[in-house]
Amino acid sequence: MDMHCKADPFSAMHPGHGGVNQLGGVFVNGRPLPDVVRQRIVELAHQGVRPCDISRQLRVSHGCVSKILGRYYETGSIKPGVIGGSKPKVATPKVVDKIAEYKRQNPTMFAWEIRDRLLAEGICDNDTVPSVSSINRIIRTKVQQPFHPTPDGSGTPVGTPGHTLVPSTASPPVSSASNDPVGSYSINGILGIPRSNGEKRKRDEDGSDGSGPNGDSQSSVESLRKHLRADNFTQQQLEALDRVFERPSYPDVFQTAEHIKSEQASEYSLPALTPGLDEVKSSLSASGNADLGSNVSGPQSYPVVTESFASHLYVKQEPHEASLTPFTPSSLASSGLADIQPFQMALTVDASTPTYSSFTHHGPHYGQFGSQPLIAGRDMSSTTLPGYPPHVPPTGQGSYPTSTLAGMVPGTNVSVHHSVQPVECCSCLSSSKPCLFHCRTGSGSEFSGNPYSHPQYTTYNEAWRFSNPALLSSPYYYSATSRGSAPPTAATAYDRH
């Protein structure tokens, strides 16, 4: 093509180029384009050639053409500028000598005064005059020579005689910097505090066994240990320090038996902890109050005395000043067991303190309990009950272990009667209608040994589901007219949400 056959003025002027651009033209890094190429770019622009065509014809990058044309349209100049580059050096040797001369004549002369004098005497013009910061830098680096103190303490800076600056205060001489390299880095050496000869001699004696600055670290530790041992510590403290020094920095997580002291092992052994546990148990049993039932959040176990009566006892619970309803589970309140319970009670020696015991219930109550007695530690809902549907989950609202149920009803004033007496339930006390539990048949008979017979049902409907807890009252559920013949206790014990 004819583009490549044309002579390139830039190539002719700069045979030793630094690189080739994308258009095939050569250039030199860090150098502006020659004036010939700049003039040619301006001429082609006056002829109406587009910048992209100028870039192709002259093999100059499009950015360079645009920059040159933009500066030409703004300033009318095609000379390269200093935009983004370094300024020309204004601190020429002539200017530096003049600044030094002004400073010798008047050492208290300011930099701006030197700048004004350079302009007034015509040494520099507005374009070449150095700035105030440049003048200060010239004075600091070239006029003021570095300060070299002499051994006698009178500092004399090296420089041209007659115009050197003497500092106001002479620096103190550094003493014994070469004789005592270790002491110069100590606190006394840094602060310049002289040490006594006895201290130096003791340090030399302690360090004479191979603990120099280039010695082994283990020997330095031994020398430090000897130094501390001779001055401050007793024999017991030294033994404790030796044990600490020999201990590894990062001990294992699982310590072995030899790392534990004998007194600690005896202190935290199981026989030593057993009396403490007994005291805690006794204090817990003695500190029971009426608020225990409301604070119980899950199944808990209480100690049970082994001595018990084999005969069935009828015990009437009489709380002092509180009702059993706030701290009794819903299953007890709904089944009529909150007031009077027939159970096999375990008696303690001191009857004045509140006691908690497990009980065994033998009377079937309206399908709530089966013919089997409750076993301590077993859930009520885990037993097979005759009238419950098979799809009810084993855990429900009334799922409490027997020990928890026994502990929720504190036996404060327990009166034991060996004679058989008729039992009254909540329904009998609060309503004049016949009791569904058959607790009083005719003239004060006992509980009926036969289970309550009722037709089994397999499905629930919305009529049996109650979400309002205000409906859980004894007269409502144990009334024959309000619920009919179906057992409401079974439905409410497992369907209350």
Curated annotation (Swiss-Prot):
It is found in: Nucleus. GO terms for cellular component: nucleus. Residues 166-178 have a biased composition (Low complexity). InterPro entries: Homeodomain-like_sf, PAIRED_DNA-bd_dom, Paired_dom, Pax2_C, PAX_fam, WH-like_DNA-bd_sf. Residues 19-75 are annotated as: PAI subdomain. Expression becomes spatially localized at mid-gastrula stages and is confined to the nervous system (midbrain, hindbrain, spinal cord), sensory organs (optic vesicle and stalk, otic vesicle), visceral arches, developing excretory system (pronephros, pronephric duct, rectal diverticulum, proctodaeum) and thyroid gland. Splicing does not appear to be tissue-specific and tissues displayed the same spectrum of splice variants. Gene3D superfamilies: Winged helix-like DNA-binding domain superfamily/Winged helix DNA-binding domain. Probable transcription factor. Involved in kidney development, acting synergistically with lhx1/lim-1 in pronephric morphogenesis during the tailbud stages. This is Paired box protein Pax-2-A. It comes from Xenopus laevis (African clawed frog).
